[in-house]
């Protein structure tokens, strides 16, 4: 099936020329190109048109899950009849396995998987396995992390055809091999049930159930039914069922893997014995033998990903399989906000290697654990066929890669201009900011404020709430899907102000924002570099009254470059508007998106609680954001014995948040202490039953 783009508007401004140049470049075999487009110029729209023109499976890589979600929503609206997929990390919480030699502390892996994102990941891989050409996958850097190989996945695809003779039990064995679980009582995603001659399969990548009925050994009907009402939705002559997990293996591969693990275990034991380290020798022996026994009996073990090389049949040091392996060789890639995404890709391998070094060195893992890793940067680049780097501020690497093939997109279809930038003294910056917020609120527009630290963002939010301003914050401690919800609530008018650190930058599409305030703009560094300031200022470029205020006591080189470049672009835009009789038009954009369906089911944390626009603005007593408290050893407190069930549940929830925050800050020792507190509190809660 070809790409069928849904266009509410026709390309205007710089877009037609940018689309033509990029399409010609891809068709002529250009390996790399740069799309240098200002904020609000419609880069995503240009990308969609190029995808439709080229007609190849496409990967769009974004540097964080929030922007990936936004891109996914937009691409879904452009290609409603094609396969637009979403592939990001499915962890709501992830504490990696670690060992701290200084305190001789081993911390076990702990995680929480988001089932909705897991479904979308499986859907993305299934679409690629199907061989469709009209596939767009929007991904975070997760696409370079290890997963099962395409051959193993393809071999596990189950094809069924009406009228085909298939023994039912043979079909059930195939389902089990594809990692579906039998559950005749509670049919959930990734399970199947059998009732007489009918088999219901709740596909792992779908919201619906596939119902297959037999007449003797012949397949009589294949239907898709609603997972709740079981009403028929569609009927098929044939159908393909894709695996329920991204890591599929056969019995033969498992047996081979166990033999290889055993061989490497003996080598590692001999190594530790040769250097006289009997403790590490005994440790690796006990741990690996236990894992092998679990794999033999159950087919899996905790940390089985550290043995992935054996199951995949890879040699030591050979790169793992990843999402890129599922694309055809002629696929097209867009790297959005490339000035941030490219460095992120290059940094992933080093961080992973550093953490595992201690685990291998001290006998917790075999050296094969090193091969369960993200791609190295050169491995990633070797897999790229043709790429378009997309950024308002491309870095030197992208410009060099493109060899001068740079397509500029300065003019906005709406006629909107780059925002006016003002520099004001940092003295009394909060009072001055408050006055600006009041003015914006009177005009029913929103405000973004960027600070230098998460603590500053939280405290400023608390201050604004205390002064009757509907405010919230987002930073790395806020759950991914909650960030999207908070930004949608800002657009809907539930908040007046959104405070952030490094998330209020690339790609955020918030046309209701008329003011961007940058606190401490003269503090040179990563968050106040030329590119960072330009990107942050760009958040005001989607509003007809857009303005940027930099609070600073001096004008740094980065500030001056941003001011000069913004002024240059503004002059070009003014001239274009005058020549073509264009009056700037405010952007109007729907708020609800493709991710909203499953976001509604995600438990909302306190700092994403919506504020009804029909109610009076909350004060600090009626609504306060979550400010991280000092750690408290709840379970060690004698008061715990007198706590009610509700109080215990709240303490467990609070401690869980602290554990997640500690893990994100790589304070694994503290996170483990919180985990132990949670276990003790849960034990106390059971006694209350």
Task: State the predicted function of each range.
Residues 28-34, 56-57, 133-135, 445-446:
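Pre-Walker A (Motif I) flank of P-loop NTPase domains
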């Amino acid at each position: 099936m070809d790409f069928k783009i849904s266009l509410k508007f026709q390309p205007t401004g710089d877009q037609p020329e940018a689309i033509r140049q990029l399409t010609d470049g891809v068709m002529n075999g250009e390996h790399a190109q740069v799309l240098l487009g200002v904020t609000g110029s419609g880069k995503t729209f240009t990308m969609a048109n190029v995808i439709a023109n080229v007609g190849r499976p496409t990967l769009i890589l974004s540097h964080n899950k929030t922007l990936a979600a936004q891109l996914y929503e937009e691409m879904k609206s452009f290609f409603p009849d094609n396969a637009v997929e979403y592939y990001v990390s499915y962890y709501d919480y992830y504490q990696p396995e670690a060992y701290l030699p200084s305190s001789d502390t081993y911390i076990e892996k702990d995680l929480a998987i988001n089932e909705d994102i897991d479904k979308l990941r499986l859907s993305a891989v299934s679409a690629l396995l199907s061989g469709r050409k009209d596939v767009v996958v929007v991904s975070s850097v997760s696409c370079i992390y290890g997963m099962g190989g395409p051959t193993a996945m393809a071999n596990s695809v189950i094809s069924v055809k009406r009228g085909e003779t298939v023994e039912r039990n043979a079909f059930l064995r195939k389902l089990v091999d594809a990692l579906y679980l039998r559950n005749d009582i509670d049919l959930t995603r990734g399970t199947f049930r059998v009732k007489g001659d009918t088999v219901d399969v709740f596909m792992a990548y779908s919201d619906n159930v596939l119902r297959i009925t037999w007449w003797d050994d012949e397949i009589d009907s294949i239907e898709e039914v609603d997972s709740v009402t079981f009403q028929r939705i569609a009927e098929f002559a044939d159908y393909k069922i894709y695996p329920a997990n991204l890591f599929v293996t056969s019995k033969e591969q498992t047996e081979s893997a166990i033999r290889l693990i055993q061989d490497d275990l003996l080598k590692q034991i001999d190594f530790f014995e040769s250097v006289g380290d009997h403790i590490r020798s005994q440790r690796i022996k006990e741990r690996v033998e236990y894992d092998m026994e679990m794999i033999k009996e159950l087919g899996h073990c905790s940390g089985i990903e550290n043995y992935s090389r054996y199951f995949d049949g890879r040699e030591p040091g050979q790169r793992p399989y990843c999402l890129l392996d599922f694309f055809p060789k002629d696929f097209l890639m867009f790297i959005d906000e490339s000035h941030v995404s490219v460095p992120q890709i290059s940094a992933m391998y080093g961080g992973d290697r550093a953490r595992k070094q201690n685990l291998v060195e001290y006998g917790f893992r075999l050296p094969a654990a090193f091969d369960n890793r993200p791609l190295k940067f050169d491995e990633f680049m070797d897999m790229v066929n043709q790429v378009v780097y997309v950024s308002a501020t491309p870095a030197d690497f992208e410009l060099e890669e493109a060899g001068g093939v740079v397509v500029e997109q300065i003019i906005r279809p709406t006629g909107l201009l780059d925002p006016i930038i003002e520099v004001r003294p940092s003295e009394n910056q909060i009072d001055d900011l408050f006055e600006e917020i009041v003015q914006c609120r009177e005009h029913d527009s929103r405000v973004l404020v960027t600070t230098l630290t998460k603590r500053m963002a939280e405290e400023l939010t608390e201050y604004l709430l205390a002064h009757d301003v509907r405010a919230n914050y987002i930073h790395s401690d806020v759950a991914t899907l909650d960030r999207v919800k908070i930004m949608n609530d800002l657009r809907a008018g539930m908040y007046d102000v959104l405070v952030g650190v490094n998330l209020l930058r690339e790609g955020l599409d918030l046309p209701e924002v008329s003011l961007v305030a940058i606190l401490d703009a003269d503090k040179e560094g990563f968050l106040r570099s030329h590119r960072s300031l330009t990107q942050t200022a760009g958040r005001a470029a989607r509003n007809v009254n857009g303005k940027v205020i930099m609070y600073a006591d001096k004008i740094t080189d980065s500030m001056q470059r941003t001011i000069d470049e913004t002024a240059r672009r503004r002059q070009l835009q003014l001239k274009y508007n005058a020549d073509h009789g264009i009056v700037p038009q405010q952007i109007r954009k729907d708020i609800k998106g493709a991710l909203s369906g499953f976001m509604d089911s995600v438990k909302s944390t306190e700092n994403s609680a919506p504020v009804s626009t029909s109610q009076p603005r909350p004060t600090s007593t009626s609504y306060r954001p979550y400010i991280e408290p000092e750690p408290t050893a709840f379970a060690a407190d004698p008061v715990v014995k007198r706590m009610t069930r509700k109080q215990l549940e709240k303490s467990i929830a609070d401690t869980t948040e602290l554990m997640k925050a500690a893990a994100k800050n790589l304070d694994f020792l503290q996170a483990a202490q919180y985990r132990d507190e949670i276990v003790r509190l849960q034990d106390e809660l059971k006694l209350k039953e």
